[in-house]
Amino acid sequence: MATPDNHGPTVDGLDGAIAGRRISGSLRVDGFDVPLPPGDWLQLSSGHFKQPTAAGELLTLGRVKDRRLVGYIRITAGRSVANPPAGFPGTPGCDRQNQNTNILVNEGQEPFGHQACWVMDHYFLVPLQAWADRSNKLPALERAAAGDLAAKGVSYPQEMISLRLTRAETWGLLEVRYVFSPEEDHITSNNVATYADSDWQPGMIDRYPEKVAYIAKLKRWGDDFWPRFKSAFSAGRQTPSL
């Protein structure tokens, strides 16, 4: 649900003319009513993809508090355009837990068939700070989102924690990355140069009890949210975008 633009101060610290529309509850993307965590979300960037056997929409949203990014969502929603439906490639990271994965919940991983999994890891935002540098190989959607945040005067932490939820069948795909800032729980990270050096890496995190507890908290959130996400995917089968 989108709310009308507001020209007064809000929790995000942005004037409505700068923020644009604020979205809460859920958002229709390519016929799927994508569920959103609580709060007001701002659209940052959007796009489309088209492949020989599939097409769909891409979207990013941000949740801002006092001009600081505290939540981020990246949505990929697509449908098979082949007859018969050709399905979607296997989701990276869902087949096994690797050295970067904090949590893996895999209920099915059949490339080009039934896929149902979610993965938790950390999301390193430092490359976004160089969004204007074309030698920095950012995906176009992330580059546009970072540029929008810069235009709004919004800063963001070095890293956040990501839960990437995926459902796919031969007819469609819904993959959403829900990203949370530990700063909202007053948890900070040591400054590091690379993703692999992060405090949040599975090989490092046991040194930080507060970070272990935060991962456990988000695991509970993921377990609770997962059925809602799966229902949204199933409900979208008969409701393609117009």
Show the residue positions of the predicted features.
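Mature extracytoplasmic/lumenal regions of exported proteins
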Residues: 68-242
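N-terminal Sec/ER secretory leader and immediately downstream segment
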Residues: 2-109
